[in-house]
Amino acid sequence: MESIEYAEGEYNSTHLEKMSTIVSKLEENGITVIIDAHQDMFSRLFCGEGAPKFYVDKLTYSTDCNTNIISSIFGLFSACIPLSKNKWKYDENGLPRIEDCVAGSFIDYHKAPELMSVYDSFFKNENGVLDSFVNFWKFVAKKFKGRKNVLGYDLWNEPWASNLWIDLKSLVPGYVDNHILSEFYAKIDEGIAEIDPDYTMLFEPIPFPDTLPLFGGHALDAFKSTPVDNTIRKQMFNVHSYCCAADQNVCKDGEPTLKDATGNCAEFHDRKLKKNKQQAKDIGVPVIITEFGACSKSEACYYEMLGFEKAADKYLSSWAYWMYKAFNDHTTTAAENQEGIFNPDGTLQSFKEKALSRTYIQYYQRQP
């Protein structure tokens, strides 16, 4: 997003044109594309990526960990550590240096009050920032309208919860989805539909507490209805499934162990995909899992992938593998031989190729 809207109302058409060229080349090779408004941790200011700096400049956010019964309840799951406690050094643009960012924990950053509260301000359109985001999507939709290989638009990647340290209701599974995100998605949809009324919306639930990292990990209630009436808009329930979300200790060393990958992880993916499939059915849309994997070059990675795919076949769920490359940005800092599917010399990581080479079950079995 920040690479396209570099200043309020100012868009980088050259960058978008390069994206369009890539999409065209993929179409020539029979590859389907999802246009994803990708972000993690909202902004470079918070050691993440996604939103332009002017978004943060116009939004209010808290640096305080409120000590009350609500924070005590949430404290059962994690500790509140403000980002201001990190001893980051900043560059000439006032942004934390990547060397300092990667020294901390991606998970811990998500628990910070600054991050939770800035999401809350954004979702509520403080100072018209959400209006700016709608205009961003309208600009993008003009470029990709009618493209045959574009499956749909993922409106916002992994929306984080409102400030869990303050708002007790946000700890209730499904509350943020139904009372904040539905309205958020509907507002974006209204803008996109002015440009591309035939597009397909992909909408995501919040990762926590909709997925609870206790007792082996469980997917809980999310949306009770689609953000927009199904008779008006094509929509897909878009979820992610990572074993690290099953329990706080599963990925304490970075990734699941081989023992977890062949046992607990497979069970978690089965429970989660079963619940997600039922949720999608209840609200009358298909489900798609657009992120799983993102694991390193290891035997454990291979078996976790197989466990996930077995569950996806069982529940007839479409999926896409998520991979990182070593681009050295703030949230994709994987080593060259990890998390992607290529080795540094350009050859494929054969075990991942093997794990991902699966027949499309609905094609050869038809609908059950």
What do these predicted ranges mean?
Residues 124-152, 156-315:
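Extracellular glycoside hydrolase catalytic/binding regions
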